Amino acid sequence: MAEDGLPKIYSHPPAESTKTTTEATIFFGADNTIPKSETTITSEGDHVTSVNDYMLENDFSTTTGNKLIPPKERQKSEDDVESHLEKEFATLMDIKNPMANESITENFLPVKTGNISSTDAISLIDFSTDIAKEDILLDTIDPGDKDVSLTSEVSGTPKESTAAIADTPILPNIMGKSDVSNYSSSVKFKVPADGNAHITDSSVPEAEITPTTERNLTTIPDITALTEEKITEIDLILPENDPNVVPKLTDSDEEKFITVFELTTTAERDKDNPEDALLTDEESTDEVSVWMERDMANEEESHSVLLTAVESRYDFVIPASVTMNLTEDLLTEEDLPENNRMESVTKNTDELSGTTPDLDAFSHKEDNFTTETGVFKLLKEEPDEFLI
């Protein structure tokens, strides 16, 4: 290489110009200076030898001279140089910006405030691992009146940039009161010299909680202890000796009674009404339509019987003379034999048939119907008491 930077020109040019190669090598020194690239071509007769396999040794220190080293030693020296450069580069970056590796972490810590179950969120701000000691402020969301200080020692490695702290602060607890909603705490961060991380949690006693009041349980009342309902019994039996006695009700006069007369006996009713009896499986499944027809027929028959009873109730009008004869005959029939008793019955029926009025004459006697001796007089009751 000439002094002016141009390559040297030899009198005999190289025989094989295609084998000529160039290489630019860049070195980074401790002073961050970049040397110039050099291209050297040597010639020994017709054979051209390049300097690509050799390089100048540079150990970033004062050297007495330059030596050519083989490729294996050169690779080893390059590895050493790279590791040395990384250390120096990291040192320079730490000096220029010492807070580059710092990070901010936020942790939400639950806070026990006496007997209140609500929690306060705490944010952890400006947590650094590169500084030996640093005070970290713990702020709560809702500021209050009182402050409580908490000191905890936490140690960690300077290589890691994040850390987590989970400590429960000590809060003053008053029985039945919990008015502390704000507190500030300073955490001292200490890094030991050996670089080992040890986390020490401060022991915090649990806040005492007032016991909850016991629930008042209501006992279920016993069914057998209920008071029995009062049932009023009314005796409506009339004395036989005095026909003028009117029954007196022991209950209030507002209550009304309905007298129901059954025209058929229980045996005939069960025979005429098959729906009262239990049905077999075949009747309930196969003969439903037949049962419905029977039900409709029975309803018509029952209604007809009731209507005839209501219409014919006013036809039984008996004069007073006939009633007196009936009572006398009934008393004498008890002493007569059976033959004479049958004759007296036929005689009484003939007299009744002769004294029974026609339907046309009944309309004229409708007004004085209640005054004559009829069905209601035989029952010793007034008609208004039974009709509603």
Swiss-Prot record:
Molecular function as annotated in GO: calcium ion binding
Gene Ontology CC: acrosomal vesicle; mitochondrial inner membrane; motile cilium; sperm principal piece
Keywords associated with the record: Calcium, Cell projection, Cilium, Cytoplasm, Cytoplasmic vesicle, Flagellum, Membrane, Mitochondrion, Mitochondrion inner membrane, Phosphoprotein
Compartments reported by the entry: Cytoplasm; Mitochondrion inner membrane; Cell projection, Cilium, Flagellum; Cytoplasmic vesicle, Secretory vesicle, Acrosome
Record bears the keyword Phosphoprotein: yes
Residues bearing the modification Phosphothreonine: T280
In-chain residues carrying the UniProt-annotated modification Phosphoserine: S312, S344
Keyword Mitochondrion: yes
Chain spans, region Disordered: 1-20
GO biological process: flagellated sperm motility; spermatogenesis
Role noted for this protein: Calcium-binding protein. Essential for maintaining the structural integrity of the sperm flagella.
PANTHER family reported for this sequence: CALCIUM-BINDING AND SPERMATID-SPECIFIC PROTEIN 1 (PTHR22810:SF1), TESTIS DEVELOPMENT PROTEIN NYD-SP26 (PTHR22810)
Protein name: Calcium-binding and spermatid-specific protein 1
Gene label: CABS1
